[in-house]
Every structure is written in structure tokens, then in C-alpha cells.
Swiss-Prot record:
GO molecular function, one term: neuropeptide hormone activity
Residues modified to Pyrrolidone carboxylic acid: 22
Taxonomic placement: Eukaryota, Metazoa, Chordata, Craniata, Vertebrata
Protein keywords: Acetylation, Amidation, Cleavage on pair of basic residues, Disulfide bond, Endorphin, Hormone, Pyrrolidone carboxylic acid, Secreted, Signal
UniProt source species: Oncorhynchus mykiss (Rainbow trout)
Keyword check for Disulfide bond: yes
Protein's recorded name: Pro-opiomelanocortin A
Residues with Glutamine amide modification: 252
Amino acid sequence: MLCPAWLLAVAVVGVVRGVKGQCWENPRCHDLSSENNLLECIQLCRSDLTTKSPIFPVKVHLQPPSPSDSDSPPLYLPLSLLSPSSPLYPTEQQNSVSPQAKRSYSMEHFRWGKPVGRKRRPVKVYTNGVEEESSEAFPSEMRRELGTDDAVYPSLEAGTAEGGEAEGMEGVFSLQEKKDGSYKMNHFRWSGPPASKRYGGFMKSWDERSQKPLLTLFKNVIIKDGQQKREQWGREEGEEKRALGERKYHFQG
């Protein structure tokens, strides 16, 4: 009696073959009562598949591997040996490694990949109820307590009790305005220079500009003109006196 695995192998070969020109039409595959006839039929179907396999007009390394390769198991073996647990595929089980078992990539060559030294230890913040858990790990002076001191941080309720409800609301609105407004870089010296120093002082209006240089210019021009006029008047007076002296000398002679 034939094993069901052999019959299943023959059925798989017949299904892969297609509708037209099946290998079952061969007289060797009509009588499957013996094991020899069954093996001959399987070999015939295999040879028919290899001869009629499509040939791709591409390079050799891009073509699909033929079923006659050494790495593919023979078709006449039982299907129980084709399972992944069979010893025919030992390398695939060794090469298949779960992604969880792979080591994570640590970017140690970047300065933010792995902190060095004491930077690895996170800063722990303790409340009043959790201080007893790690009292031995950290000394008392290194702990940061999150205490709520009413003297340092007055609550809004105290302000409302004293009639300062408007002040509390103004503080809330001021915070909201800071969030909604544009960010001003006041801590940089180029954020908002005074108007007198913007663009070297050339973009100021006429009223904003200092008028001292203009007044000094007018004053210098007036003084210079006055000096020139006085010199001219002095020369004219000298010429007149000289002319009068010549006339007196002429009349006396």
C-alpha cells in the first residue's frame, strides 16, 4: 500500500503543471500501483517543468533559480521532509534570528549617544513621602524636596481672601499674554537697540537728530564772514587814509 505522502507529492506536481499538457496524459502516469511507476511519473513531470520553464531575456544572475539546483530538495521526497523542522534546512534556522535578539545600535560616536561619567545618573526628585526609600543611596544634602511653602509661594486663595482677586487674575492674564506674544530676545544686545544707535544714527528723523552740528556750522560761517568783512573794511580805510595823506602833501608842496 502506498504512503499518503507519495500521493500528495504526485498531486502537487500535477497541480503545478497547469491545465494544458499535463504530465498525467503520459501512459507512465496511468498506472501508479507500484513505487517504480510513481517515481518515473514524478521524474517525467520534473523534466517537463524544467524544459518548459520560461527564459527571461535578462542577465544570468537575475533569472530565477532552476529546480535542479543543489539547494532545492528533490520532489520525490516525502512532504514531511519539506517542513521547516526537517534536517534539510539547518542553515535557515540558524540564520533566522528574531529582531528582538539583535543588539540595539548605540550611537557612541556621537556626543549625545551615551553620556560619560556622572551624567548617566539621572537627577532624582523626592517628595516628602518617598524620602525613606533611597536614604542610603543619596545623602540628605543632595535630595531635592518639593515642599509647598506658603511664605515663598502664596496661593491665589490667600490673595482673594485679602481682596486681591484682581491681582491674581492679572498675573494669569500676563502669563497668557507672554505665551501668545512674540518671543523677544531681550538678553541679546542686538534685540532692541535704542533709536539713537540704530543703523549708526543715520535713520533718525529731523526732530530726533541733534542740531548742534548745524548750529556750529552756521556759527563758523557767520564768524568767518565777519572776519573777512572787517579785514576788507580795514583795507579800505587804510587806502583812504593813504590817499588823504598824499593829497595833503601835494597841496603843501
